[in-house]
């Protein structure tokens, strides 16, 4: 490197002597690929990619926290993997979503909004960016509560280096306004941004995405502001939400640009994470055909090296989820292994890395299935027209059909879909529980949404993780604490937020998560 540096310095010196530094040095010294000159559409795509955790940030937080809190995926290991399994604040992992969104996603998307807001030829890109910005901020505020919002990601634009923290109530009010204006503002007769990687510039699909996200945001407020929730649910339905799985907001990966959850679980974490017993037990008890697509068990494995294809079984009847409340030592005692009928901790069921978590498996942000299930709840509350049972059935069917998007081998035959729907009709007496339990299944592998809707709805009715050492005072973790770095770089503002919100702990409830 030193040799190359000396060579380049010598070359530039020679050029100056031969031509005069003032003549063309400014031209030579101009960075033709300066990020500040990148096309906004390119920056928009990068924001979409980064929000999908393609760069790895946030993935470990989902694995250690969100998936574990909702008891779908769990690890028995501690140290760097400690989290929901031990009801513990692991300061190495709880800041990861914060870091990814503020350092990458929001810096990019705020820049796109700023660069296109006054350009009459880029109104569609401007409104697409506003929708993606709302999606990104929803994840952040749902995860942490009060956060920098109005002054966030404006260090370059406005030289704001210590942004204030806005209340979640104020954030949601603005998110809903932004989604309302941006979704309505999309216009297929104007310049179409055909290079966008989410919908290829399809304005009709972007509109349906925007209104479906508005529905999701509106339903977040069911416990704390039902009047506003109803208002925006009505707006979303009127505007037009997703109509089929073709409208899903999905990131499609390739062999080169991998699904980062799959990347983690196919590499260094391959033997560390397992399907949790409550999730497996629910799917088994209901003869759910999704279990065959989701789970694999390396029957009889007594160590990581024995988790090989010859032992792999996707037969639903042999799947065994790892119980909650154990670490790698206690789950390996002879009594526990005998109780669950497994040879070792490596014998519990895992996520199938050849189907839903193969390296090029898609990742879903907002889906038709989720949207129909939210409409079912809205109809149950009397906030929209339509039949609750019809929305419910459409939502469950949509997710069953969605399994085919992962891999042809994960597709569920129509006969199996129909049999499952026939066996599990909506029970009006248990409608909210049924709807949101199906939402739990339909949101598998979408950590932020799983965590948010579980807190909002209270379903499924999970049992508290019984791990003996716990840092929480609630039955479940309610939010992620702010990064320690914030107390160093933005102390006054973060302290104000902590005081307003009621503490910076795993047990502190965010505004919409009212008891």
Language model features with spans:
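Terminal processing/anchoring signals of secreted or surface-associated proteins
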Residues: 1, 21-23, 47, 134, ...
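Bacterial Sec-dependent N-terminal signal peptides
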Residues: 1-30
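Membrane-proximal, proline-rich intrinsically disordered regions
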Residues: 21-75, 100-103, 107, 111, ...
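Short acidic (Asp/Glu) and glycine-rich catalytic loops that position anionic groups and cofactors
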Residues: 24-26, 352-353, 411-417
């Amino acid at each position: 490197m030193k040799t190359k540096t000396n060579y380049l310095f010598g070359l530039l010196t020679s050029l100056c002597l031969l031509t005069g530094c003032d003549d063309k040095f400014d031209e030579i010294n101009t960075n033709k690929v300066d990020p500040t000159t990148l096309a906004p559409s390119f920056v928009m795509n990068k924001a979409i990619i980064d929000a999908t955790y393609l760069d790895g940030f946030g993935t470990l937080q989902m694995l250690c926290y969100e998936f574990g809190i909702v008891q779908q995926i769990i690890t028995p290991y501690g140290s760097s993997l400690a989290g929901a399994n031990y009801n513990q604040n692991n300061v190495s992992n709880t800041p990861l979503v914060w870091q990814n969104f503020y350092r990458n996603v929001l810096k990019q998307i705020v820049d796109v909004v700023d660069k296109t807001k006054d350009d009459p030829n880029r109104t569609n890109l401007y409104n697409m960016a506003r929708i993606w910005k709302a999606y990104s901020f929803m994840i952040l505020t749902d995860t942490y509560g009060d956060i920098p919002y109005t002054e966030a990601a404006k260090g370059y634009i406005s030289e704001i280096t210590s942004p204030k923290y806005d209340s979640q109530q104020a954030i949601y009010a603005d998110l809903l306004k932004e989604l309302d204006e941006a979704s309505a503002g999309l216009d297929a007769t104007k310049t179409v941004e055909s290079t966008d990687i989410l919908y290829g510039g399809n304005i009709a699909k972007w509109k349906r995405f925007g209104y479906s996200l508005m529905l999701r945001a509106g339903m977040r407020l069911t416990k704390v502001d039902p009047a506003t929730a109803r208002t925006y649910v009505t707006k979303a339905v009127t505007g037009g939400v997703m109509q089929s799985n073709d409208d899903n907001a999905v990131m499609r990966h390739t062999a080169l640009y991998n699904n980062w959850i799959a990347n983690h679980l196919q590499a260094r974490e391959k033997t560390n994470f397992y399907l949790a017993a409550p999730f497996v037990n629910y799917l088994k008890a209901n003869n759910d055909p999704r279990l065959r697509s989701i789970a694999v068990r390396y029957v009889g494995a007594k160590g990581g090296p024995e988790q090989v294809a010859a032992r792999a079984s996707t037969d639903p009847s042999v799947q065994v989820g790892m119980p909650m409340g154990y670490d790698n030592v206690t789950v390996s005692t002879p009594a526990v292994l005998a109780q669950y009928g497994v040879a070792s901790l490596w014998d519990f069921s895992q996520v199938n890395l050849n189907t839903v978590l193969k390296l090029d498996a898609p990742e879903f942000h907002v889906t038709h299935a989720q949207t129909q299930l939210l409409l079912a709840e809205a109809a149950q509350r009397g906030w929209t027209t339509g039949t609750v049972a019809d929305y419910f059935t459409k939502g469950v069917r949509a997710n069953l059909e969605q399994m085919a998007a992962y891999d042809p081998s994960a597709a569920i035959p129509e006969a199996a879909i129909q049999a499952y729907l026939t066996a599990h009709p909506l029970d009006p007496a248990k409608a909210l529980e049924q709807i949101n339990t199906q939402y739990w299944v339909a949101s598998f592998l979408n950590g932020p949404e799983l965590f948010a809707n579980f807190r909002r709805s209270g379903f499924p009715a999970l049992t508290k993780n019984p791990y003996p050492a716990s840092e929480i005072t609630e039955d479940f973790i309610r939010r992620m604490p702010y990064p320690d770095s914030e107390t160093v770089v933005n102390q006054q503002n973060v302290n104000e937020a902590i005081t307003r919100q009621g503490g910076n702990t795993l047990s502190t409830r965010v505004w919409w998560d009212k008891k």
